[in-house]
């Protein structure tokens, strides 16, 4: 790391902190030559591979923008959208490492969005899954109902009512 004051390559880390919900590291450094202190931000790059083979950096803002459109008119906070984007980024990092196919980002959005707001989920899914008719919506609504019932059902082997 070059010192911004004297261009020396020799510096030591004085302090390190995780920022941006663990995606980046903020390091406070001190130049060994001139003792100037400066800050660096380090982050692991996540690349999105588009259908045509072109790669670009993952953008939480793009995720938020797409989901915000689906949430238009719904009571969904900006903080909730930021948490969802972070959750999506973490999920694709775990599943795909440093490069993720673009279509996997849309898939990773669906589950947390379904939990956040079912109407927004239907809107997003209708575009992502290219719904063509009312039956597509009906099938997705049935899937939502089944998911909701599965979450509400007690775990198998749960005898809490017997006590």
Swiss-Prot record:
Task: Offer an example of a GO molecular function term for this protein.
Answer: zinc ion binding
Report the HAMAP family cross-referenced here.
NrdR
Query: What is one GO biological process annotated to this record?
Result: negative regulation of DNA-templated transcription
Signal peptide range: none
Query: Which family does the record assign?
Result: Belongs to the NrdR family.
Give the PANTHER family listed for this entry: TRANSCRIPTIONAL REPRESSOR NRDR
- What does this protein need as cofactor? Zn(2+)
Q: Where is the ATP-cone domain?
A: 46-136
Keywords, alphabetical: ATP-binding, DNA-binding, Metal-binding, Nucleotide-binding, Repressor, Transcription, Transcription regulation, Zinc, Zinc-finger
Question: InterPro entries, per this entry?
Answer: ATP-cone_dom, NrdR-like_N, RNR_NrdR-like
Q: Where are the zinc fingers (unnamed)?
A: 3-34
The organism that produces this protein has a lineage beginning with: Bacteria, Bacillati, Actinomycetota, Actinomycetes, Mycobacteriales
- Domain of life (superkingdom): Bacteria
Query: What does the cofactor field's note say?
Result: Binds 1 zinc ion.
Q: What does this protein do?
A: Negatively regulates transcription of bacterial ribonucleotide reductase nrd genes and operons by binding to NrdR-boxes.
Matching Pfam families, A to Z? ATP-cone (PF03477), Zn_ribbon_NrdR (PF22811)
Q: What is this protein called?
A: Transcriptional repressor NrdR
């Amino acid at each position: 790391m070059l010192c911004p004051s004297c261009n020396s390559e020799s510096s030591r880390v004085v302090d390190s902190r995780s920022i941006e919900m663990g995606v980046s590291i903020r390091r406070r450094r001190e130049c060994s030559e001139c003792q100037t202190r400066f800050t660096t931000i380090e982050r692991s790059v996540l690349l999105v591979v588009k259908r045509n083979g072109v790669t670009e950096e993952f953008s939480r803002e793009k995720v938020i923008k797409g989901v915000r459109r689906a949430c238009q008119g719904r009571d969904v906070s900006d903080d909730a959208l930021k948490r969802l984007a972070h959750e999506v980024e973490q999920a694709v990092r775990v599943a795909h490492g440093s490069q993720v196919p673009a279509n996997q980002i849309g898939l990773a959005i669906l589950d947390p969005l379904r939990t956040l707001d079912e109407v927004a989920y239907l809107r997003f899914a209708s575009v992502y899954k290219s719904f063509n008719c009312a039956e597509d919506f009906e099938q997705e609504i049935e899937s939502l109902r089944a998911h909701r019932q599965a979450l509400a059902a007690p775990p198998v082997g749960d005898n809490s009512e017997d006590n």
